[in-house]
């Protein structure tokens, strides 16, 4: 599951490498449609989901890997973050993986006109709590098309439930 992956090319790359049972969720139907058009017939191989991640219901579907590059840090209120984590607990298979990318401790305070929450690995792990075993983390600078650098924190966990 690629959270916020609307116009991302991650799904293209995974399909090209032979991965199956892929899913993408984005709040923007236009972003999903853009990627479906880009993928053409290959789009039929992907499960597409449009909606707000804090209110989404995947039903009985379970995922081996949950990937979020830059959605979670937009959840600035505790209730939204709790709803997100509860959904991850429901949707990721036991012993599955969660890969998160958020703005790091020195990252921007807002993005696209919206406030964000910055994280270090301990704070992010605290948000997820028991049941998530931290396997590693890394700080990296992302060079934006605008010519600036944004600090990102990448964390990967294994669901231990």
Where are the language model's segments positioned?
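Conserved acidic residues
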Residues: 64
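Class I (Rossmann-like) S-adenosyl-L-methionine-dependent methyltransferase catalytic domain
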Residues: 1-61, 75-91, 96-161
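A conserved beta-strand element that flanks and buttresses the S-adenosyl-L-methionine
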Residues: 67
């Amino acid at each position: 599951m690629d959270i916020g992956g609307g116009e991302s090319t991650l799904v293209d790359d995974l399909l090209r490498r032979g991965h199956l049972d892929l899913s993408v969720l984005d709040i923007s139907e236009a972003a999903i449609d853009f990627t479906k058009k880009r993928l053409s017939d290959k789009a039929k191989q992907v499960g597409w989901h449009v909606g707000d991640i804090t209110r989404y219901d995947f039903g009985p579907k379970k995922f081996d890997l949950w990937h979020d590059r830059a959605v979670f840090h937009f959840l600035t209120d505790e209730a939204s973050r709790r709803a997100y984590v509860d959904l991850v607990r429901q949707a990721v298979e036991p012993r599955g993986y969660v890969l998160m990318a958020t703005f790091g401790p020195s990252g921007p305070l807002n993005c696209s006109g919206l406030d964000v929450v910055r994280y270090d690995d301990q704070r992010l792990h605290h948000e997820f709590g028991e049941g998530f075993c931290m396997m590693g983390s890394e700080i990296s600078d992302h060079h934006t098309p605008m010519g600036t650098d944004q600090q990102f924190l990448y964390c990967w966990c294994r669901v231990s439930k």
